[in-house]
Amino acid sequence: MSDSYKGHLVIVVALEHYNPLVILRTFGQEGIYPVYVGINYKAPVASASKYISACHHVDSIEQSYEVVMREYGHIGEQDPTKKPFLIFGDDDVYSYYELDHYDEMMSRFITFNAGEKGRVTHFMEKEAIQKCAARHGIPTLKSVVVPTGQIPEGIVYPVVTKSISPVTGGYKSDFFICENEEELKNNMALIKTEKVMIQPYVDKKTEMTIEAFTYNHGKGMFAGVECRYLYTIKGYYSPLFDSYLPKDKELLTKLNSMMEEIGFEGIWDAEFLVDKSDNIWFLEINFRHTPWANPATRGGNPLVTLWCEAMLTGKCREPQDFEPFATMVETVDYAKRVEEMKLCSFPQWLGEFKQCKCTMYYDEDDLEPWNVTVANWDILK
């Protein structure tokens, strides 16, 4: 057991959630037990993992930074060849570090970056990243960005509203499906962000994500898994999805060119909508590790450890192919399919859960987070 990857301490900073749990387990399965700085959230699922060398509980993003610098900032400052890895799982956490403490962070740690202060946060904005995708030939939905409260002329209903960035306004609570202008006006009064993106509503067949990382200022790329939802929920993600190795080389090349333009070094997730005619439409990039990387680990492509290797050596192996399998977010899938949508009975769901190759909370080799999940089931679903 070690707390380091090839002599570099590993630090994970994230809200208490199943996302950092995935990161910790990925490292742990390779004998690396990271430091975890957990920002209190719904339930302490990640900090219950056995794959932690030291755990710090904090109540805010600002406190997380204070702990990281006080306890570990001196390591890279004293010996730049031993800079710790600093890995993030939340947009707002990373954005705070990048906007408020970029120089200190980059001088002391190996971490996600695009070469200059605020550049990653800029491309978190949906308008900026969609324009970038369009420049590289990836289809995007026609969108308009307006000050919240302003109703644009000439749009065709139904439409959806979205916060312009994951670090402003209400983010997911700013999402509404509006069938007409009256509904749009009413929902505008509830939106918290100062600017809102309005897009045509597409009756989707599914959604898909590609989980990947880039290095060498975005020039090198590794795509570890593609996920497609097995059932759709209007205005919500599906917590049950197929997982397999990405096959669309042309799309991967275009994503790589986007990342090279941005200069991003880090783990990321690209999201797409798939319409009834199987056309794909680019939605956004999450410039962070997401739990959808869990099936990449299961398939033999652990993004976090391979990214660390690429950042040290400037190169990376080819992705390992694997047989497709289903991945489940247990609490949310139960709530949606059994309780709300009545798509299956509890015995049927339980059977599928037991057969599922990849789950977010349950891991027979690391059971305490599952015990915490069961004890806080209603909070986490």
Segment roles from a protein language model:
Residues 1-113:
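ATP-binding N-terminal substructure of ATP-dependent carboxylate-amine bond-forming enzymes
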Residues 159, 221, 279-284:
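Protein kinase-like catalytic core scaffold
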Residues 308-381:
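Peripheral (often C-terminal) accessory segments that flank ATP-dependent C-N-forming ligase machineries
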Residues 37-43, 92-94, 216-221, 226-229, ...:
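Short glycine-enriched loops at secondary-structure junctions
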